[in-house]
C-alpha cells in the first residue's frame, strides 16, 4: 500500500508517496503527490478520508506531483487503500494526458 506521510514543503502537509518502495532506500529524492482539503471534483484527484489516516475529507492532487528530498518526509500517518489504487491510476493518466 502506498504510504501517506507528513512532509515539510511550503508548509507541513500530507503527501502520498508515489516512488515504489523497493527503490526508496537507494534514492535521495522521492516522487510525491500533495494532499489537500480543497476538493474541486477534478478527474486528477483521488478522494481520501479518515480510513486513510486523515482528519477530514481530502484529495490527492495528481496535477501537482513533485520530487522532494527524502528527508522532507516526517512520519507516516496513513496509506492509500488497495481499492483506491485504480482511482490513482486514472487520476495520473488524466494528469499526464496518457489516455
Predicted regions and their residues:
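Conserved functional hotspots at enzyme active or ligand-binding sites that engage polyanionic ligands
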Residues: 1-99
Amino acid at each position: 500500500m502506498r504510504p501517506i506521510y507528513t512532509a515539510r514543503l511550503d508548509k507541513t502537509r500530507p503527501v502520498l508517496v508515489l516512488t515504489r518502495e523497493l527503490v526508496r532506500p537507494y534514492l535521495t529524492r522521492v516522487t510525491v503527490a500533495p494532499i489537500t482539503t480543497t476538493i474541486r471534483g477534478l478527474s486528477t484527484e483521488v478522494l481520501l478520508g479518515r480510513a486513510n489516516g486523515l482528519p477530514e475529507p481530502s484529495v490527492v492532487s495528481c496535477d501537482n506531483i513533485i520530487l522532494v528530498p527524502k528527508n522532507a518526509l516526517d512520519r507516516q500517518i496513513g496509506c492509500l487503500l488497495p481499492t483506491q489504487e485504480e482511482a490513482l491510476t486514472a487520476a495520473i493518466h488524466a494528469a499526464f494526458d496518457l489516455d
